């Protein structure tokens, strides 16, 4: 069974709105074992929407549309669908009542054009919308299925989850299950080289590498009749990848590096502090994304100036004068200083040049020294990151967290 997504709306076509619905629906369809090879975006124009329907049904069994269910004249998805299937638009009394109740409850005046949203193609199944006024519909005709959903994600997603997914599950004879392998420390090309034979031999499961802003993710996907059967296909491939890539694999579930580090700190009952210069508090901010981090995170300091490094962390002025703020020596003193003054077992520190100005031939933009202190031992890593200011800060943050992870798992 093949599906195709059609996003309807001139605002999407012009780039005024990001089509996040397509990403969500693609992932959900894959999880249901429904193949999808095409997506379309079309403006609010009857002829072009009709053409999009023709194109989709020439290669797919199911069309899922989003958008064009509002009360205005350019919201024409249901009208075009009714014409396409040669059906009349009729009033759905339950939908009309719900629309009226929606406005009455909010003490707002309902204009006549809102009643347009209660019209559905004759014979269609109504999909209730508990978060807005536009119901969706399912049309089945001559072995064709069309599922029409509203554009706002806060309305579309619950409708898909509560009504469309169970409907599609009954029609699918298999499911897709995916697991992710998250990697730091080596690039996409190096990862691909390490597992080239696995990628070349893939059938079921499949292996798909993705380069992220920082790091690489592999998605392993298997198709089977049940989830357990799919997982049995995935597990040996996942284990082989972990064996080959070693400590570069930081997670085999969809979690971020800060959550991995937070879990390790809590598990080992190690307290942590941070002192950041070029990252400006980003490491601390990432860590406190994790609920429960307050058990171990005691303090975060942003020590941007030399004075702050000296006064708050106790970095020796002689070291600052001799080696400069951006140096291995300063990073070492920062790591020791924040751990000592905050009385923590662990610390992460950064000092560097994020740019776009401030670099020299000796110390270019992107140069960052990252220090990790763990119970008396300091590890320093010299890094040269590429990209704009925010990219440098992000790479330094992720690298610092990954340095600590690698130490804690030894």
Curated annotation (Swiss-Prot):
Protein name: Putative competence-damage inducible protein
Entries under SMART domains matching the protein: MoCF_biosynth
Top-level taxon in the UniProt lineage: Bacteria
Species this protein is from: Clostridium beijerinckii (strain ATCC 51743 / NCIMB 8052) (Clostridium acetobutylicum)
Family assignment from sequence similarity: Belongs to the CinA family.
NCBIfam families: cinA_nterm (TIGR00200), molyb_syn (TIGR00177), PncC_domain (TIGR00199), PRK00549.1 (NF001813)
